[in-house]
């Protein structure tokens, strides 16, 4: 039976500082490291034995994956890194304090930027340090694919091809997979897996450092069950398709 574990990185420095992060490559806090280690412990207790891992190219997700795999004694499994699993790009909001941004633009506007499906924040300038054109890790990505800002819809548009070409076929082959990524790239995967409507995805949140363990049918698409392994820090999940 295929299994999939989705893990949002542990608490980052900018999570702690309440700043918009996006593609900015900030590190984990000590609490984030502890959450990542706990993820490995929770998955080990659940008997989870991944055969392959996927992760973004941002260090907070990479370190979360490594600490998790260490707890599983599975550091040896193959790991694929892809920019397509990066967090949503927050455009000109990157680095800004969220409370100050609410005070300036209003709660409702900021909620739309953060939680709506198809409204991106204002774009970042192409000469800004936070534009991916100026980051060497994206040197091999076609220029036209690099975002200056993203909505959840555009995040889904870049995540979905990677899911379809690299992740889902392995599930259909019966593998056990782990994906370490970010709040919005994982929301995109949740939308795909649970078939969540555009309006309903606004209310879906993915907590940091709490594995979402999903059991699938042999087709690697149909969900059998899904649960967060730490119920104390769990967020509500959408209903299973067809339930």
UniProtKB/Swiss-Prot annotation:
Q: Which GO terms describe its molecular function?
A: phosphoglycerate mutase activity
Q: In Gene Ontology terms, what is a biological process of this protein?
A: gluconeogenesis
UniProt KW keywords? Gluconeogenesis, Glycolysis, Isomerase
What InterPro entries does the entry give? His_Pase_superF_clade-1, His_PPase_superfam, PG/BPGM_mutase_AS, Phosphogly_mut1
Keyword Isomerase applies: yes
Q: Provide the reaction this enzyme catalyses.
A: (2R)-2-phosphoglycerate = (2R)-3-phosphoglycerate
Task: Cite the SUPFAM superfamilies for this sequence.
Answer: Phosphoglycerate mutase-like
The family database entries (Gene3D superfamilies) matched by this protein are listed as: Phosphoglycerate mutase-like
Q: Which domain of life is it from?
A: Bacteria
The EC code for this enzyme is 5.4.2.11
Q: In which pathway does it act?
A: Carbohydrate degradation; glycolysis; pyruvate from D-glyceraldehyde 3-phosphate: step 3/5
Q: Where is the active site?
A: 9 (tele-phosphohistidine intermediate), 87 (proton donor/acceptor)
- Residues carrying the site annotation Transition state stabilizer: 182
Query: Which residues are involved in binding substrate?
Result: 8-15, 21-22, 60, 87-90, 98, 114-115, 183-184
Assembly state and interactors? Homodimer.
UniProt family annotation: Belongs to the phosphoglycerate mutase family. BPG-dependent PGAM subfamily.
As for what it does, the entry says: Catalyzes the interconversion of 2-phosphoglycerate and 3-phosphoglycerate.
Q: What is this protein called?
A: 2,3-bisphosphoglycerate-dependent phosphoglycerate mutase
Tell me what organism the protein belongs to: Maricaulis maris (strain MCS10)
* Biological classification of the source: Bacteria, Pseudomonadati, Pseudomonadota, Alphaproteobacteria, Maricaulales
